[in-house]
Amino acid sequence: MKIVKLQDIIGTEREVHGEGWRSRRILLKKDKMGFSLHETIWPPGHELRMWYKNHLEAVYCVAGNGSIEDLETGEVHELYDGVCYALDKHDRHILRGGTEEMRLVCVFNPPVTGLEVHDEDGAYCLVEDDDD
């Protein structure tokens, strides 16, 4: 059994800062769960175009508000506490912060190693680590 406390992640290499957002990597590939689990903090008004072409992602909003735009259909979906979205088709999208900071619980498959950064498409490359 693994027990991970958020307080033990903050300020370590498992707390990753990106373009305006920060992500706490709770479970990673080396934890051998078959997925990775993150808490992502998204600031009000911030937006980022992404396309996880190498990963599937499910995101559950537990606080704040914002929206996600499906770039294939143009549909915009409001996000707030209790809403989940799943990028089950490697969907190109724009995530936008609303009027309050969003707190998002994210699951990636395949799991990330924690070393990934968004590329020019807004995707994570598949990263191999030494813990396989």
Curated annotation (Swiss-Prot):
Question: Which Gene3D superfamilies does the entry mention?
Answer: Jelly Rolls
The coiled-coil regions, if any, are none
Q: Print the keywords alphabetically.
A: Lyase
Q: What processes in GO biological process is this protein linked to?
A: ectoine biosynthetic process
Annotated pathway: Amine and polyamine biosynthesis; ectoine biosynthesis; L-ectoine from L-aspartate 4-semialdehyde: step 3/3
Q: Which reaction does it catalyse?
A: (2S)-4-acetamido-2-aminobutanoate = L-ectoine + H2O
Q: Does the keyword Lyase apply?
A: yes
Q: Which GO terms describe its molecular function?
A: ectoine synthase activity
- Top-level class of the enzyme under EC nomenclature: lyase
Query: Has the keyword Transcription regulation been applied to this entry?
Result: no
EC identifiers of the protein:
4.2.1.108
Pfam family, any one: Ectoine_synth
Q: Which family does it belong to?
A: Belongs to the ectoine synthase family.
What is the recorded function of this protein according to its Swiss-Prot or TrEMBL entry?
Catalyzes the circularization of gamma-N-acetyl-alpha,gamma-diaminobutyric acid (ADABA) to ectoine (1,4,5,6-tetrahydro-2-methyl-4-pyrimidine carboxylic acid), which is an excellent osmoprotectant.
Q: Which HAMAP family match?
A: Ectoine_synth (MF_01255)
UniProt xrefs under PANTHER family: L-ECTOINE SYNTHASE, PTHR39289
Name by which UniProt lists this protein: L-ectoine synthase
